[in-house]
């Protein structure tokens, strides 16, 4: 999809619904899929390409004059966006921040660098980072911890086929975050805490989960906020009601931070 097509879609959504959207810009991390498309671009170069791609989108949406851009991967000449998008609807940009190349791309674009976090007590402080920072997690929380774990086990049972697929994906991905999570899963094998990688190990999702009581999960979320993370991308919940439980967690975390 050409950057102009993306910009046109964003502009159309803005005019139709008067709502701001966020764009999650992905460089691609599964080498076999890229090779099937005859895309042999190295990991860091893919982020350089992503910067060019996103820069054209940003310039089209932010400006009222024609856009000309000469890059290594993309070239446009006097390309105009009609109608222009209102300034208050300019999309936020999210970029993977798990690798140095991703962090550099986020900084170049003024984007939020999103990562897959370590357990809260091990997460490095990022408050001094140049870019805004966020994390992707799943949350299963209830008033009673045993209830939360019962739901977690029902939602993510052991899946041998999924485990084999996960192992294959480890061999074909050059994504820094995939390697980091896989290493942490191996190191924590046989243990069970609030930070839970079982869904990731069974190829059901690509992020860690926080499981436990409202108070316990909120304590972990509060620690991530104290580290400097301000954006939280949640794994897709199975039902609307699950969002109500998650909202209680964030309300509790905010209360902890104001004490």
Locate the predicted segments by residue.
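Internal, glycine-rich beta/alpha segment that forms the wall or movable "lid"
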Residues: 2-112, 121-122
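Conserved beta-strand positions in the central sheet of alpha/beta enzyme cores
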Residues: 22-24, 114-115, 134, 233
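Active-site beta-loop-alpha junctions enriched in small/polar residues
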Residues: 26-30, 98-100, 118, 136-142, ...
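An alpha-helical appendage that flanks or caps ligand/catalytic pockets
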Residues: 37, 43-83, 123-223
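Alpha-helix-loop-beta-strand connector modules within alpha/beta enzyme cores
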Residues: 49, 53, 247-259
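Outer-membrane beta-barrel pore domains
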Residues: 207-211, 230-237
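Conserved, well-ordered alpha-helix/loop/beta-strand core segments that scaffold catalytic motifs
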Residues: 220, 227-230
């Amino acid at each position: 999809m050409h950057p102009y097509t993306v910009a046109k879609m964003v502009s159309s959504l803005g005019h139709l619904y008067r709502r701001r959207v966020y764009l999650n810009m992905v460089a691609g991390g599964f080498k076999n899929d890229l090779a099937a498309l005859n895309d042999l671009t190295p990991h860091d170069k893919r982020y350089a390409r992503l910067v060019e791609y996103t820069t054209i989108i940003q310039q089209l949406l932010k400006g009222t004059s024609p856009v000309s851009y000469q890059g290594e991967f993309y070239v446009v000449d006097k390309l105009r966006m009609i109608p222009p998008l209102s300034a208050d609807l300019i999309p936020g940009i999210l970029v993977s921040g798990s690798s140095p190349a991703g962090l550099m791309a986020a900084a170049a674009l003024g984007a939020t660098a999103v990562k897959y976090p370590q357990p809260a007590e091990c997460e490095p402080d990022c408050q001094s980072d140049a870019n805004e920072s966020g994390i992707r997690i799943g949350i299963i929380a209830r008033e009673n911890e045993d209830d939360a774990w019962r739901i977690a086990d029902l939602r993510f049972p052991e899946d041998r086929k999924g485990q084999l697929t996960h192992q294959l994906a480890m061999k074909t991905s050059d994504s820094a975050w995939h390697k980091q999570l896989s290493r942490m899963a191996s190191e924590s094998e046989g243990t069970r805490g609030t930070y839970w990688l079982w869904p990731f190990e069974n190829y059901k999702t690509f992020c860690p989960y926080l499981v436990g009581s409202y108070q316990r999960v909120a304590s972990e979320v509060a620690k991530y906020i104290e580290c400097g993370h301000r954006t939280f991308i949640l794994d897709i919940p199975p039902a609307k009601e699950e969002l109500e439980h998650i909202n209680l967690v964030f309300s509790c975390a905010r209360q902890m931070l104001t004490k």
